[in-house]
Amino acid sequence: MKIQTNAVNVLQRTSAYLKSGLLKETPAWYNVVASIPPSTKFTREPRFKNPSNGHIIGKLVDVTEQPHANNKGLYKTRPNSSDKRVGVKRLYRPPKLTYVEDRLRSLFYKQHPWELSRPKILVENEIGDENYDWSHMLQIGRPLDGESVIQRTMYLIKTKQYGDMVEAYDHARYEFYALRMQEETEQQVALEEAEMFGSLFGVSAIEHGIQKEQEVLDVWEKKVVEETELMAARTSNPAGSWKDDTTLNTAQEEESTTSENLHF
């Protein structure tokens, strides 16, 4: 099958169209593709290192260079399917992108799981983050959360105030603790002042949910008690007595009905 090179030659064909006059205006992507032209090599080459961190992800083993023989006294001259499977499976797989911020986030929320219960607006960090000055942790228009610790840590590393990641993270974490305690103290003082001046606060969303749940549990408890008493009454009396009582009641009702019909 002939190799399709139409997508690769898009820069050459567009240049020819511009030179001949078929295209009047230069496309917006033309200069970008011209500065970084697409590759013309169609053979897949194994990557032995992860380009993001430089770690070795695998290597090809030349079985012909092994000097020893197997248990049968034979020398291997070519790789078998199992040898190829081990190397090829990872060499041609695209490397996983890893970021330092993600490692710091996982560490912070693992140490502080209750921070995940706080309300949070999910937005991309790149949108508007260039306006924040992370020389201090408190930011105008941004609540104090775990992301503040991450960005503060990265700022300390980039400005070389701390050479060690652990020391920078601990410094940002201690700043976060102090600001969180100050925030909770201010909220508690504001609540006590409002109550002192006669403010009345309704139940919170959690308390409202607990009340509704308790109402359902009360109805369930009443129903269970009635069913339990009924089952205890049935098991304490023999089955025949229930049958005899039912037969006796039915006979009495029929007798009373007959007497009423015969009464003039």
Curated annotation (Swiss-Prot):
GO CC list: mitochondrial inner membrane; mitochondrial small ribosomal subunit; mitochondrion
Signal peptide extent: none
Swiss-Prot/TrEMBL keywords: Mitochondrion, Ribonucleoprotein, Ribosomal protein
CDD domains tied to this protein: At1g26750 (cd23701)
InterPro entries, alphabetized: Ribosomal_mS23_fun
Keyword Ribonucleoprotein tagged: yes
Region Disordered: start-end pairs: 233-264
Family: Belongs to the mitochondrion-specific ribosomal protein mS23 family.
Any one GO molecular function term: structural constituent of ribosome
Cited function: Component of the mitochondrial ribosome (mitoribosome), a dedicated translation machinery responsible for the synthesis of mitochondrial genome-encoded proteins, including at least some of the essential transmembrane subunits of the mitochondrial respiratory chain. The mitoribosomes are attached to the mitochondrial inner membrane and translation products are cotranslationally integrated into the membrane.
UniProt-recorded name of the protein: Small ribosomal subunit protein mS23
Keyword Glycoprotein attributed: no
Complex and partners: Component of the mitochondrial small ribosomal subunit (mt-SSU). Mature yeast 74S mitochondrial ribosomes consist of a small (37S) and a large (54S) subunit. The 37S small subunit contains a 15S ribosomal RNA (15S mt-rRNA) and 34 different proteins. The 54S large subunit contains a 21S rRNA (21S mt-rRNA) and 46 different proteins.
Misc. remarks from the entry: Present with 1920 molecules/cell in log phase SD medium.
GO-annotated biological processes: mitochondrial translation
Subcellular location(s) of the protein: Mitochondrion
